[in-house]
A protein has these predicted regions:
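Gly/Thr-rich phosphate-binding beta-strand-loop-beta motif of the actin/hexokinase/Hsp70
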Residues: 1-26, 116, 120-145, 161, ...
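Glycine-rich phosphate-binding/hydrolytic loop that grips phosphoryl groups
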Residues: 236-259
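Glycine-rich phosphate-binding loop plus the immediately following alpha-helix
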Residues: 105, 112-124, 146-189, 251-255
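N-terminal glycine/serine-rich phosphate-binding loop of ATP-dependent small-molecule kinases
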Residues: 1-92
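Active-site neighborhood for divalent-cation/phosphate handling
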Residues: 82-127, 133-134
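Adenine-nucleotide phosphate-binding core of ATP-dependent small-molecule kinases
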Residues: 30, 177-213, 237
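Short hydrophobic/aromatic-enriched beta-strand-loop microsegments
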Residues: 78-85, 145-151, 232-243
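Glycine-rich phosphate-binding loops at beta-strand->alpha-helix junctions
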Residues: 13, 59-66, 191, 210-227
Length: 259
């Protein structure tokens, strides 16, 4: 077994998984908010035991300060590990990057697209990663990243309309959806924001002629019930946790361990 540490440093949380380069499952996983990033060292120490990984593949969209902090923690808990900071390129793990400037594509979007391709090989797919921002990207059946769209995430969209954070509408995953014509302001904000998110995903799915829609991200459990009502997506919707991490793992699986 060759263990790798995968790290996904997003805008809100840092997620990680310890994986075997030759296996599908994860050996361990965890996460921490940026404010609690110091907890990662303890999580990693527990997961690694006496055998820290020799290789790390990390995607970071949270800036250079977060990268520096992660490098310091990795040096302490996995000294000598070879660390690759994942960046978008013209092609990787069987996915061709169709961006006009491939290096300009966010590494999280490229990783998510690689993950979607690995989960739905040979199929036209749309992957929606619903976090601080919602990204909706298209991959064709031949394995080419076609492009995509970026819009404010569900929370950001709602907070821009609410008067203050204490008045943000609250919803539990799987709860009843608000009426599309709400009779109170909180539900009206929520209905509008959910409709905007779901509508953008449905439109992308239709325009791409996709046969599968992969939904991921922290807001996915809130958006999924509305998408489940869309006849266009019947039988095509799949909720997948940690799609960026799935993409990083797909890279490790595809490329194996370096000699």
């Amino acid at each position: 077994m060759s263990a790798w540490l995968l790290v996904d440093a997003g805008n809100t949380r840092i997620k990680w998984a310890l994986v075997d380069s030759a296996a599908d499952g994860w050996l361990a996983e965890g996460a921490a908010l940026h404010a609690d990033a110091a907890d990662l060292a303890a999580q990693w120490g527990t997961a690694f035991g006496a055998a820290p990984p020799l290789r790390v593949l990390a995607a970071n969209v949270a800036g250079t300060a977060v990268r520096t902090r992660l490098e310091q923690m990795l040096a302490a808990v996995a000294p000598g590990a070879a660390v690759e900071w994942f960046a978008s390129s013209a092609q990787r793990a069987g996915l061709v990057n169709g961006y006009r400037n491939p290096a300009q594509l966010g590494c999280d979007r490229f990783a998510a697209a690689i993950g979607a391709r690995a989960l739905a090989p040979g199929r036209a797919v749309v992957v929606a990663n619903c976090g601080t921002a919602t990204t909706i990207d298209a991959i064709d059946a031949a394995g080419r990243f076609v492009g995509g769209m970026i819009l404010p995430g569900l929370g950001l969209m709602a907070s821009s309309l609410a008067r203050n954070t204490a008045q943000l509408p609250q919803i539990q995953p799987g709860a009843l959806l608000p009426s599309p014509f709400a009779d109170n302001t909180d539900d009206a904000i929520l209905a509008g924001c959910l409709s905007a998110q779901a509508g953008a995903i449905e439109r992308a799915f239709a325009r791409h002629g996709a046969v599968e829609c992969i939904l991921s991200g922290g807001a996915a459990p809130y958006i999924a019930p509305m998408l489940a009502q869309a006849p266009l997506l019947a039988g095509a919707l799949r909720h997948v946790d940690n799609i960026v991490m799935k993409g990083l793992h797909a890279i490790v699986r595809a490329e194996g361990d370096p000699c």
